[in-house]
Amino acid sequence: MPSIKRDTTITEYQDFIRQVYGLNNDRYFSTEDMLTQIQRFIMRGLKGVRKNDKEKIKINLLVASSWFMSLLNQLHIEIEGEVWKRFPHLCSYCASCPCACKDKHPEKRQKVAGDENRRPKTLEGFQTMFKEIYPPDKRTLEDAGVHLAEELGEFSEAILAYRGKHNDSGFENIILEAADLFSCYMTLYESAGINAAEELYNTFSDNCHVCKKSPCECSFEDIMGFKS
């Protein structure tokens, strides 16, 4: 039976989402539908940021990130490797850790090459890595929320552009934007004082967090009516 372990890897988490929600996703939702669900729950999470409501931030980020994994599964994008390629314990733009973009003012993205020995082994390890690259004391919670919204917009644009042209370069852009969006999930979790791996374990340790079944047996009406 699928479950999320406390020390889950990103790949294990993505596979859990595939096993539990893949059937319903295939039956009920297109890529654009799932993108709407990501937007829906991120916006609810940002309402939590505005109200300084940690519980509202937490549940909505957890649900949004699981829809994000569902969309990546539909597109057959294994995100863990892509995140490491984009952020090999370094800022993807200035190639420094911690990020020094404000000091260096790089005019273009620098080439990044990481040390595989420093690659995190777990989701919690990746959250720690992003904490080191982008220290939470350098931004406010609101800053982290706005950045997540910005990257969500860029990810959405990449999806829609690819659906319009169906070319390889467009698909590669989706992968890059997905890695950027993942990084912003991690930095908002960190700014809010939320351990993503621990909360995913608490929420999804017994299959679907609503019906407790695998595969999920929630109806379309249940999914669309979920309150958070």
Language model features with spans:
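Flexible "arm" and connector segments at domain edges
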Residues: 1-228
